[in-house]
Amino acid sequence: MSRYLARYMVSRYFSSASSRPLHVCIVGSGPAGFYTADKVLKAHEGAHVDIIDRLPTPFGLVRSGVAPDHPETKIAINQFSRVAQHERCSFIGNVKLGSDLSLSELRDLYHVVVLAYGAESDKDLGIPGESLSGIYSAREFVWWYNGHPDYSSLKPDLKTSDSAVILGQGNVALDVARILLRPTTELASTDIATHALSALKESSIRKVYLIGRRGPVQAALTAKELREVLGIKNLHIRIKQTDLSVTPADEEEMKTSRARKRIYELLSKAAAAAKTSEADPDQRELHFVFFRQPDQFLESDERKGHVSGVNLQKTILESVGTGKQIAVGTGEFEDLNCSMVLKAIGYKSVPVNGLPFDHKKGVVPNVKGRVVSHTSGDISQTEPGLYVCGWLKRGPVGIIATNLYCAEETVGSISEDIEEGVWKSSKAGSKGLMQLLEKRKVKKVEFSGWEKIDAKEKQMGIERNKPREKLVTWEDLLAAAAN
């Protein structure tokens, strides 16, 4: 039997017209979850897909992670909304895996469970002083200015001094630097949370330091994001000329990567332009600080328990293997004073009970999206009916579109397993889930509830001349959904 015919026969077996629909549950309503749902619905005409999320709002980091001054990136929401409105798809928000229901209960209810809940925690540096107040992860800061209900009450210290330090030089670091330095008049017409805009208007921050362990050639950012921050009005760029010196190893890296060469050229051009112009005392400054790594955080003498700076160790690059250079500490140290530190060193996924998890890599062990319970030699034992997609599958890397290919691979594995006849028993699916949630008095938010939230936010936005005014507390979100 051909592969096409086998897939057709399986699709007919799990037909919506029969008593054996294929019940699929996707945990997480970000890009990975919606792309997976879309591909499952297209591949299997008998599939019924439920997308659950702990938040009452769908779309994951497209809503809470994308910077407010990047509205074009949020266009993906239109496609995801069409998926959620599909007759064989349901969004069920305000349902938390691990507390409202367990993974084992989901697996009992559905033929297929796909975990796509991303990375909602942060990597730690593991250095002294990391618990001082005034130190935040970039994720916390991003969720604060994007109106995430978990962080709407955050009070980042923007007024104690004129300096903030960002550890990391990737695109997330550039995002938070841009929000700190961009004129608030330009942010006012975006969907930035009002509490964040008000705080930024009163901010004393005038100098932002972007700290990287390696050099400008190795900076983990993209030219598009860099050009945007370099183009901020009345922003003075500062880069030490010595940091722009390149070695033969750097030259080799740029030969093999046009992107790295372009980044270096943009930084060099910005540094040269800054040398020929005098800094206005009222200008804001963005300092790119290379070849430094944090050794410890310094505590304020005046404000006990609060950060007052970062002790940095100078680094040099050493070649390891072909074309790769790593940062090595030199034993020389210097202090950099600040009142706020943002750690943009990476997101981290968290496990749930009953889920195999690689704590070192921060991912669920998997083979092409199939969750692996244990491995012996070259043989991997997989968990029947349990799959993973997105950051939980591959780590917190890539852009929104990366999840499209990731979902394609996972759904390919699901289809192969269906063809092999892995599931032949009936499952309760949506009906069983709704009964369980009702029994536990969980206030679920369906897509119609989200549409009420969406309509209210847009209406409030019209009144304030912005795309939307986000509801930023759990109470307000749930009240709007139930209205």
UniProtKB/Swiss-Prot annotation:
The keyword Flavoprotein applies. The keyword Flavoprotein applies. This is NADPH:adrenodoxin oxidoreductase, mitochondrial. Its EC number is 1.18.1.6. GO terms for cellular component: mitochondrion; plasma membrane. It comes from the Eukaryota. Keywords: Biotin biosynthesis, Electron transport, FAD, Flavoprotein, Mitochondrion, NADP, Oxidoreductase, Transit peptide, Transport. FAD binds at residues 32, 53, 61, 97, 391, 398-400. The gene is MFDR. PANTHER family: GLUTAMATE SYNTHASE 1 [NADH], CHLOROPLASTIC-LIKE (PTHR48467:SF1). Its cofactor is FAD. GO terms for biological process: biotin biosynthetic process; electron transport chain. Residues 1-14 form a transit peptide. Associates in vitro with the adrenodoxin-like protein MFDX1 to form an efficient low potential electron transfer chain that is able to reduce cytochrome C. Functions as accessory mitochondrial protein involved with BIO2 in the plant biotin synthase reaction. NADP(+) binds at residues 169-172, 213-214, 225, 398.
